[in-house]
Structures are given as structure tokens and as C-alpha cells.
């Protein structure tokens, strides 16, 4: 028996909290590697890889009616690259990366790699036992894009030491890292994830990323991660149409495709898909000691008509625009995370006025611990870019945020969203000559520090 009955039951129920411990590739103590993958509509699944020069694959065996396929490859070993050859009902076979891979080839290569159990010896016990997400806990977050922050630093360990010195010297309490999960284009924010369980290989292996988090923790710096459960790319070798059908996504493009980003939207109504995402959140916290997740694009998950034409979406069962499955998923996610990691932070990037984002689930909320205050960022920067001569007509841009400042547990972001697409740096947004720009920037920072919110 390759997979235990309890694992199969919990997976199909959508409640397995340790998916990575039985799905994917696992090195066996007696030799070889066991592979397991979910592809319920496939007619055959083979695993191919380095062990035989990517020749004839090993056929996996269907595991009862669970939709899972599993098998052992005696010649496979740690570090080997592999893919699944998934044959659809139409007879077409496509090479797919492992959705549960815990290590990947460095892009632009796209194969998964066999990862061994971690050998990292954690030294952050003091941090892990003392961290807190309680109201009033200090929270000053420094957002970092690993690929562009110090481009000459090419690995997790080198980045860790210099980043720890910089952040500690600036008085920040946390870093928010982007991008961490594997993605195809290194020049991006990493929001088109192709390896949800795989730290990007651009900066080293999984244990190297563990070392990054460990070093920051030992310096008293928390680590948050940008996390993307809203959508995924259409690359054929990844999650898209994984077994020849819409498996992780909706079949109807009005529900399953995002028109702005050209990506697929997760099918939150499917137990296995929700399980894949919830377990992924737990994976980063357990295996990598991540202190919290900044959940990207929550607004796009909550509304069925988000960025869609009037005839380009499907109403819910009550005729409304709310995505009931996504709401249930977010509540399940935050409930499970709070149960497993009570001191973890869950931060929502939610750009509308959806009520009770940071209220407890039992009181009708979504259960996040924090919400990015996108409205405050827009209004404040709009005010600051106005010439001081004219600001007396625009004080409402500053005061309006105070009307709702205590309706949620807000984080005040000055983030990547405001520098992309030619928007320029914060300094470049300020009016006047260089002296005036720096003075205005100091005023902006002082206002941010004084405003209620983290």
C-alpha cells in the first residue's frame, strides 16, 4: 500500500493539513523515490526524469477512487529532475511539473527536483516562542524583492546577512519577502506561481531559504511572505488543465479566467483545491518558519464580477456578485492557520470596502489579522504630490482615512504598487526642488508613523 487510507480520506474531504508529507516526491529509506500526484481525469500517468536520461517513464498506479496516482522508482534519488507525463482522455500526453514539488529546476528550466528531508538545524527557538500577533505588538515592515534589492547578492545566505544588518539598522521589525514561491519570470513580482510548494531556486535550495529565515529570526526580525492563492498562470507544463481537464480552475472562462492578468482562477468550490492551498499556507509556516502571509489580490477573489464586463461573469446561487466559495475558502484558511499557528499573521491585500476583513470568523468576518489600507495609500500620496500652495483645498484626503481607521486592523502600505509602471519612487512623487522633495518625504514618513495602523 503506497498511500494510507486515512491520507486518501482526508485529502478527498479537503481537510488534510500535511499534504506535502505524502504527495509529491519522497526519498525512501530503503532506496528509491515514491511519487504521488492528483490527476483524477487522466487515463495514464508516468514519471520521467534524470535517472534514465528522460527515457521511458515509470507508470504510476491509480489509488482507488481518490484520483491519486502513486508509484516507486528504484533508480531515482535526491536531486534528480523529473516530470509527470499525464495522458488525458483524449489520448494526449503532456509533461507536467509536480504541483507538490518541494524543489524545482532554476528557471527558465521547468522540471521538478527530488528534495530530501531538510538537514537545516534551526537556531531561532527564542524567536519562535516569543513572537506575537497581538494588537499593539510592534509592526514595521520592510518590503523586499529578493532579485532586485541587491542584484549582486545571488544566494539566500548572502542576502540574509546584509538584509538583517540593513533592516535592524533602520528599525524595522519584519521583512515582507517577494517573490519566494517558484515562478517563471525573474523580473516579475512572482505573482504567477508555478511551484506553490517550491522555494524559487534562483537563490539556492530549500535549506538555503531556511537559513535566510533563521538568520533574520536570530536578529529579531520577523519574516512575512507574499502569497498568491487568487490565480495561477496558463503555462502548459504547470497547473493549467493538469489532467487534460479544468482541474484546479473552473471550466467556464467567466469563472475560471482572469481577464486582466491572463491567468486561471482557482476553483475554490472543489475540496481538493482548497486543501492544496490551505496546506500550502501551513507548509511555509511549518517547514520554513514563516511568520505570516500577505495574501495577494483578495478583492479579485471576493467578487465574481471583479474587472469583468457585465456579461462576463456568473452570479452566485442568490443572484449576487459575491464569490461564496472564495469567502468560505478564506474563512477556512484563516481558521486553520489560527488553529495550527496562533501567533502567525494573515494580512489581506483587499482594495475595496468589504466589511469585517479582520473580524473573527465566528462574528461573520473573514478572519485575517491585518488588512492593507489601500485607500489610505492612494489618498495620502495624492495629497503629497499636490503642490503645498494648493493643499489647503485637499485636506480631506488626509482626514478621510480617520473616519474608518478603527473599522479594521489596518497596515499602512507604501508598497511596490506605487512604484511600478513608471509611477516612480516616493521621492519622485514629491513636488518642488530636491530640498523640498526630501522635506515632503520626511513629512510623509512622519504622517505615516502618526496615523493609526501598523
Descriptions of predicted regions:
Residues 38-45, 52-54, 408:
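Short proline/glycine-enriched turn/loop motifs at strand-loop junctions of beta-rich domains
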Amino acid at each position: 500500500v503506497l498511500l494510507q487510507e486515512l491520507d486518501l480520506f482526508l485529502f478527498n474531504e479537503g481537510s488534510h493539513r500535511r499534504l506535502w508529507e505524502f504527495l509529491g516526491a519522497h526519498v525512501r529509506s530503503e532506496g528509491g523515490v515514491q511519487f504521488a500526484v492528483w490527476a483524477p481525469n487522466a487515463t495514464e500517468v508516468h514519471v520521467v526524469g534524470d535517472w534514465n536520461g528522460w527515457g521511458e517513464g515509470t507508470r504510476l498506479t491509480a489509488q482507488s477512487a481518490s484520483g491519486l496516482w502513486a508509484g516507486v522508482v528504484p533508480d531515482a534519488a535526491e536531486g534528480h529532475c523529473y516530470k509527470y507525463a499525464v495522458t488525458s482522455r483524449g489520448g494526449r500526453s503532456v509533461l507536467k511539473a509536480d504541483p507538490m514539488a518541494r524543489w524545482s529546476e532554476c528557471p527558465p528550466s521547468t522540471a521538478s527536483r527530488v528534495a530530501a528531508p531538510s538537514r537545516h538545524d534551526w537556531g531561532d527557538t527564542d524567536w519562535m516562542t516569543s513572537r506575537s500577533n497581538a494588537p499593539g505588538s510592534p509592526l514595521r515592515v520592510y518590503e523586499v524583492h529578493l532579485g532586485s534589492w541587491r542584484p549582486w547578492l545571488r544566494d539566500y545566505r548572502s542576502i540574509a546577512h546584509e538584509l538583517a544588518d540593513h533592516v535592524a539598522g533602520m528599525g524595522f521589525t519584519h521583512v515582507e519577502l517577494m517573490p519566494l514561491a517558484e515562478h517563471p519570470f525573474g523580473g516579475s513580482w512572482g505573482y504567477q506561481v508555478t511551484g506553490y510548494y517550491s522555494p524559487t531556486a534562483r537563490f539556492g535550495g530549500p535549506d538555503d531559504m531556511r537559513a535566510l529565515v533563521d538568520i533574520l529570526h536570530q536578529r529579531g526580525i520577523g519574516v512575512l511572505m507574499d502569497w498568491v492563492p487568487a490565480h495561477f498562470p496558463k503555462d502548459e507544463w504547470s497547473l493549467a488543465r493538469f489532467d487534460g481537464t479544468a482541474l484546479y480552475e473552473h471550466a467556464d472562462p467567466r469563472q475560471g479566467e482572469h481577464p486582466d492578468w491572463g491567468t486561471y482562477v482557482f476553483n475554490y468550490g472543489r475540496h481538493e483545491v482548497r486543501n492544496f492551498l490551505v496546506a500550502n499556507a501551513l507548509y511555509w509556516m511549518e517547514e520554513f518558519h514563516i511568520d505570516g502571509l500577505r495574501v495577494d489580490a483578495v478583492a479579485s477573489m471576493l467578487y465574481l464580477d471583479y474587472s469583468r464586463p457585465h456579461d462576463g461573469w456568473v452570479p452566485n446561487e442568490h443572484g449576487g456578485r459575491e464569490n461564496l466559495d472564495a469567502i468560505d475558502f478564506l474563512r477556512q484558511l484563516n481558521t486553520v492557520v489560527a488553529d495550527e499557528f496562533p501567533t502567525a499573521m494573515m494580512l489581506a491585500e483587499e482594495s475595496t470596502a468589504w466589511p469585517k476583513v479582520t473580524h473573527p470568523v465566528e462574528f461573520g468576518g473573514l478572519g485575517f489579522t491585518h488588512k492593507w489600507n489601500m485607500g489610505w495609500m492612494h489618498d495620502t500620496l495624492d495629497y503629497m504630490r499636490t503642490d503645498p500652495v494648493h493643499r489647503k483645498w485637499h485636506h480631506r484626503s488626509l482626514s478621510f482615512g480617520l473616519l474608518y481607521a478603527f473599522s479594521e486592523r489596518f497596515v499602512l502600505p507604501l508598497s511596490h504598487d506605487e512604484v511600478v509602471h513608471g509611477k516612480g519612487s516616493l521621492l519622485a512623487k514629491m513636488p518642488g526642488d530636491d530640498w523640498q522633495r526630501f522635506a515632503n518625504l520626511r513629512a510623509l514618513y512622519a504622517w505615516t508613523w502618526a496615523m493609526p495602523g501598523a
